[in-house]
Regions:
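Short active-site oxyanion
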Residues: 6-7, 61-65, 84-86
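C-terminal binding/interaction regions
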Residues: 2-10, 14-15, 93-150
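Short, structured active-site "lid" loops
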Residues: 49-67, 71
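Short, solvent-exposed amphipathic alpha-helices that sit
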Residues: 17-28
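Mid-chain, well-packed structural core segment of small domains
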Residues: 67-113
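Charged helix-capping and loop-helix junction motifs
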Residues: 48-51, 90-92
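A short beta-strand-loop structural module common to alpha/beta enzyme folds
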Residues: 32-43
Length: 150
């Protein structure tokens, strides 16, 4: 069972409704939830909220992050610009679980316009319950973090 119990969530205007539901769901599961916004459906810039989530992880205030926008793609692109962040855009439970087990992802990005609420909850549950295996997977992560030597 995963012991990482502090989760930071952020969203833009296209993901705010699902983010709020995920916050409540994760609290019910016993997680400490940090909600960095947005709190409105007024148009806003998703990189602002990706930065807030990534900075919260970088300072050690949270163990895992969740970003929600329309598709999850823009958030994942923005989040992966930050040192130490391994963000994956997932639309199914298998990918969400394996990105933790094999890629040691610390941020999952999902799309409110892509997923229904039930599937979104299942994806997040798969992500937060999985743990990194290490071993050969750590070697591969080191390769993309430090560059590949041929």
């Amino acid at each position: 069972m995963n012991t990482e119990r502090r989760i930071v969530l952020g969203a833009d205007h296209a993901g705010v409704n699902l983010k709020e539901k995920l916050c409540a769901h994760l609290k019910e599961l016993g997680f400490e939830v940090i909600n960095v916004g947005t709190f409105s459906t007024d148009s806003c810039d998703y990189p602002v909220y990706a930065k807030k989530v990534c900075n919260t992880l970088q300072t050690g205030e949270a163990d895992l992050g969740i970003l929600v926008c329309g598709t999850g793609v823009g958030m994942s692109m923005a989040a992966n610009k930050y040192k130490g962040i391994r963000a994956a855009c997932c639309s199914d439970t298998f990918s969400a679980r394996l990105t933790r087990i094999h890629n040691n992802a610390n941020v999952i990005c999902i799309g409110e316009r892509v997923l229904g609420e039930g599937l979104a909850f299942d994806i997040i549950d798969a992500f937060v319950s999985a743990e990194f295996e290490g071993g050969k997977h750590q070697r591969r992560i080191s390769m993309f973090e430090n560059g590949v030597e041929e």
